[in-house]
Amino acid sequence: MKNILIYLILFISIAGCNKKIEQENTAELKDKQIRLFWNWFVANEERFSKVTNNDKVLKEILNHASTIEGGLAFEVNSIKNGIKSLTISADGVKQLIPTVQKMVEKSPKIKSWKFIAFRQKKDKKLSTEIIYLSDQLKLEPSKMKFFPIVENDSLQLIIYSPGINKENYNEIFYGGSVLLDNLVGEYKFMTQVDNYDFHNMPTRKEDLNQLTPLFELSAFIDNYDAMKNKNRVD
């Protein structure tokens, strides 16, 4: 019996060590892939800066970044004076937050490029713009609303928009998720909102009266976070 117990302890210890080594090897491999990605980017950044079609640059970046971790998203934008920005996004996947942070932390210093972690909150003009997801499908933030559900320090949201149905739900969900990142800020949205979904706008007046305009979402989340922190201190 004593021998069996010793064997079990040894087995657990070895298994624990193996798991730790595996995690360290995975982290080292990811660091290496990030380093190789940025080395490749530096070697090509002058060419990227001259390309007017950002989609072409984006396609190359996505291809080379796929070795780091699946699920990452990228956005290339021209800012001004020949400077471009590369936004690295977790695309709503919380598990990818450390990878995004590490990639930007390890990014090179290049005068003509700005590297940004997560989609940033945009100005209030976004709430009045129309976002076209396709020729026949659009989102109008000014006509969208939300309903919060707060339970035990958990925030869930139902986002309402006109015209949502089974056929366009997936497209609405992805386009709407990017919109929420732009309205609130991707990092804040991911870390403060536990779950969310998109529903078709109700028609009954009593239901509509319970909803809040979508452009107020950022302020609501700020207040929710402040209240949650206050309760923890108390």
Placement of each model-derived feature along the sequence:
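C-terminal motif of bacterial Sec signal peptides marking the signal peptidase cleavage site
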Residues: 14-16
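Internal, hydrophobic cores of structured domains that mediate oligomerization or house catalytic pockets
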Residues: 92-194
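Bacterial lipoprotein signal-peptidase II cleavage site
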Residues: 18-23
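Sec-dependent signal peptide recognition
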Residues: 2-8
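Surface-exposed, low-hydrophobicity interaction/linker segments
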Residues: 35-72
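An N-terminal, globular interaction/scaffold subdomain
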Residues: 60-105
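Long, low-complexity, Ser/Thr/Gly/Pro-rich intrinsically disordered segments that act as flexible linkers
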Residues: 24-46, 73-80, 115, 119-124, ...
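Glycine-rich, aromatic-bearing surface loops/beta-hairpins
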Residues: 165-234
